[in-house]
Amino acid sequence: MTRSLKKGPFVANHLLRKIENLNLRKEKKIIVTRSRASTIVPTMIGHTIAVYNGQEHLPIYITDRMIGHKLGEFVPTRIFRGHARSDKKSRR
């Protein structure tokens, strides 16, 4: 189910404050956050946000094509190492 339009997108307050402060000063710093549920809004374009994946903070450069998506969509939390191999040779 999608979010109601009258509520607007969810963006963590601390993240929004940091981005607005950097936009006022016209600085480009890496913003470290754990808020994977925050929606990417147009004020974030051009910033690099390091999002926590459970082990480390992975930096993401925000572009205009990412608007409307969540930060967590761009940071994988699981590592796929491939399916288990079949042991047909050892069974013979």
Swiss-Prot record:
Subcellular location as annotated: Plastid, Chloroplast
Entry keyword Lyase: no
Protein name per UniProt: Small ribosomal subunit protein uS19c
A molecular-function term among this protein's GO annotations: rRNA binding
Annotated keywords: Chloroplast, Plastid, Ribonucleoprotein, Ribosomal protein, RNA-binding, rRNA-binding
Family that this chain belongs to: Belongs to the universal ribosomal protein uS19 family.
Gene from which the chain derives: rps19
Function: Protein S19 forms a complex with S13 that binds strongly to the 16S ribosomal RNA.
